[in-house]
Amino acid sequence: MVYLKNILIFLIIFLINPLVKKNKKSTKENDLKGPIALPIIGNLFGLRNDTYSIMDFYHKMYGGIYRLWFGDYFVVSLNDPEIIREIFIKNYSNFSSRPFLPTITFGSFNYRGISGSNGDYWKRNRNLLLNAMKKSNLKQTYDNLSDSVNSLINLMKEFQSSNESFQPDMYLRKYALTTMFKYVFNETVSFENKIVQGEEAELIDNINEAFNFMTLGNAGDFFKILQPLYYQYLLYRGGCFNRIRTLIRNRYIEHRKTIDIENPRDLLDLLIIEYGDHSDENMISIVQVCFDVILAGVDTLASSLEWFLVMLCNNQQIQDTVYNELKETVVGPVVTLNDRPSTPYTMACIKETIRLKAPAPFGLPHTTDQDIIVKGHFIPKDSMVLINFYSLGRNPKDFPDPLKFDPNRFIGSTPDSFMPFGTGPRNCIGQALGMDQIYLLLSNIFLNFKITSENGKKLDDTDYVSGLNLKPAKYKVCLEKR
């Protein structure tokens, strides 16, 4: 009996202590507010399956900055553009690091590359990548981009002429992949077949699986006692990461054998030249940099393309307005980047889609190196910091009636809170190419086709959690020739 009593006392203390620690009221006026945290798990309950709506609910309750507990980690959610810029532009050196979590450790190959690395190692990788990108053959990349657009449009015409329903997800990912393969490896991916198969299909599946592993709310990331076990689980189940790296490493080896430093063929050649000596560490860094570039350039971009088709399929009047603008503006049979300044409504539709369906709702987390007060809010050292892009785009203060799809919000000016690619030194360095890819494909699709659902009803536009990304459910559409 005494034994059971002691166990009960221990359990009560075990549960009460973290409950008090995580919810104690501070006398400091600048301490962050947030929801009550449960013992041990904190605020993790329910997050994995409904992350975005729960975090948006907290934003409405606690404002532009609030605190949470993810297991053992004190988390700060940023939802105010002024605070975000204060942190990641004026104080970026204190917030530039990534937290040490099993998922980031594994996904970045032990904090290498560009997305997951820290400190001087990150600065070196970023600078070398930027140097390589400045020297890359953009004409070659954009010529291939135009070819990819034309190839996909022609493939869609085959579906249209045969009255087949078109399921866009794999084709949009293949489109994104073609640009990355040309840019990084100087390889051309063919659109000849209606079925996406072989190495391309396998790589697309591996990229999708890798993003799913990065879901916010993994218990193994946020309980320190579980982290070693979770890392072993990732080693066992996370073969998708290694399969992608193996594909890149094989191309690295081939490039090393055939490189002409006077005539670099692609980004991989330029990275080999920029890194200099051919040490194993430099090889690993280059492979991981390419890994980061390809993942960021395929899945998030394809998700934005998918959402755009959903939103315009569900808003036929807006779709017709886009078509009329393109028809009146475009001189030739295809839309080019030169047409973009003359098609503001089409661009507004793209921005409105990205606002409402943020491609990376939280991105990757940051961590604080030192205690700091930002805009009157105290953020302690070792806090995990998230930019809540999802709530930024749905703040009624900046976007009245935020759930309504209304491209007119972006006619004339762009609100300060529209920052889907981040801000500061760790923002997305490929955003210009990404926006060009989106504009070229979508404008040409809607110049050529009227898109409707199979049954005449609206497509499901529910937000689906998929790792780091927000994706729609799989869907099919009917293509009608314009």
Swiss-Prot record:
Keywords: Heme, Iron, Membrane, Metal-binding, Monooxygenase, Oxidoreductase, Transmembrane, Transmembrane helix. Belongs to the cytochrome P450 family. It comes from Dictyostelium discoideum. The gene is cyp508D1. PROSITE patterns: CYTOCHROME_P450. The lineage of its organism: Eukaryota, Amoebozoa, Evosea, Eumycetozoa, Dictyostelia. It is found in: Membrane. It is an enzyme of class 1 (oxidoreductase). Its cofactor is heme. The chain crosses the membrane at residues 1-21. The keyword Oxidoreductase applies. Heme binds at residue 428. This is Probable cytochrome P450 508D1.
